[in-house]
């Protein structure tokens, strides 16, 4: 990737033309795509985590919008520390359920609005049409039936086992949690699965928050056949099975019910 100084100094730019990224064709004109590079999503996640100056970290994706006032409400819950789940000795992370909204809708500002959108069909659970099991949250039906309340609380403590053995949650954690494997790319998929296995073996509790959630940038995701990505996915699956999983077993051991 060329240094930013080289790009800036390459030629004069007429600022009256507006921002160049507004006219960019992100499908074909991105440097990554022109050079057939893979998107190193886990490198980005780890850099973001290690660069954070706070104790708690939300290693989320840039297109996932947190519900408003999440930091203040979360930290107040931590300050109160008045729920049994918060005082258990197990290592823990705080899970945010994820949703999609249609391209004509604005992200909901609270859980009440989210539930209303789910009932009308303008919102759906994340990846429902792509990989519903990957983001199916324990007690999700009960979560949706529970009315919004004041503040923030732990709704349920889940585990990455049983029906949720392939769960890929996004959560608030700390830098004591296992890092993401940087050999995995966005194009190859399964980029959070190996970390999920480590969390399971280490007996992490997944504390699902009641009035907090993430919403993907508007637009419902639908399946699109991508032959190049299918090839990369197959290679990634082999890498995980033959190389990464044996390494994880040496590093963290095994636990009944845990799988990548």
Annotate each predicted stretch with a short phrase:
Residues 200-214:
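Catalytic donor-sugar/metal-binding loop of nucleotide-sugar-dependent glycosyltransferases
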Residues 1-30:
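Acidic donor-binding segment of Leloir-type glycosyltransferases
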Residues 57:
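Short aromatic/hydrophobic "clamp" motif used to bind/position activated sugar donors
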Residues 195, 199:
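Short active-site alpha-helical segment characteristic of glycosyltransferases
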Residues 60:
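Catalytic metal- and UDP-sugar-binding loop of GT-A-like glycosyltransferases, i.e.
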Residues 22-37, 45, 49-50, 64-188, ...:
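Conserved catalytic core of nucleotide-sugar-dependent glycosyltransferases
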């Amino acid at each position: 990737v060329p240094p930013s100084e080289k790009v800036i100094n390459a030629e004069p730019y007429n600022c009256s033309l507006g921002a160049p990224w507004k006219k960019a064709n992100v499908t074909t004109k991105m440097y990554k795509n022109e050079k057939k590079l893979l998107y190193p999503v886990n490198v980005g996640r780890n850099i973001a985590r290690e660069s954070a100056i706070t104790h708690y970290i939300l290693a989320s994706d840039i297109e996932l919008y947190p519900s408003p006032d999440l930091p203040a409400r979360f930290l107040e819950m931590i300050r109160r520390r008045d729920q049994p789940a918060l005082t258990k000795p197990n290592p823990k992370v705080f899970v945010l359920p994820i949703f999609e909204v249609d391209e004509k809708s604005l992200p909901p500002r609270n859980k009440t609005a989210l539930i209303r959108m789910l009932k009308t069909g303008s919102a759906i659970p994340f990846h429902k049409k792509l990989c519903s099991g990957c983001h199916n949250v324990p007690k999700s039906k009960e979560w949706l039936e529970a009315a919004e309340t004041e503040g923030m609380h732990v709704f349920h403590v889940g585990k990455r086992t049983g029906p949720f053995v392939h769960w890929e949650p996004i959560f608030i954690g700390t830098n004591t949690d296992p890092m993401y494997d940087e050999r995995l790319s966005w194009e190859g998929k399964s980029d959070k699965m190996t970390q999920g296995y480590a969390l399971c073996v280490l007996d992490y509790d997944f504390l699902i928050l009641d009035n907090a959630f993430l919403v993907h940038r508007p637009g419902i995701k639908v399946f699109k056949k991508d032959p190049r990505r299918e090839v990369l996915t197959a290679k990634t699956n082999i890498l995980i099975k033959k190389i990464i999983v044996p390494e994880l077993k040496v590093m963290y051991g095994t636990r009944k019910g845990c799988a990548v």
